[in-house]
Amino acid sequence: EKEWRPFLMCVIPMIVMFNDYDKYLKYAGFDLFEDVIDTSFYRTSRLKHKFEIISNNFEIIENDLVVDGKFKTDIWKRLKINQKKFLQGWTNYFWKRYNEL
């Protein structure tokens, strides 16, 4: 599903979903990078405003979090932790379903 792609592909998640979707992601243990981007887009239902915030976030990412086309080391480590959490969850789900067969 599209909402899991940022975690799999190691990018900062900015997922356009229903309001307060970030609460579910945080509950699952994912880092949403609230300390470096504006995550208020999760709490607005106005699409134009949501996309304005996300557009500003892309500028922050490009100007402050990337060096020579790569994420800064501290950001990259956090992205890899998100990826690991996602993959572990998938592995657990797969084996649970497999054992049910």
Region locations from a protein language model:
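Pol beta-like nucleotidyltransferase catalytic core
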Residues: 3-9, 13-101
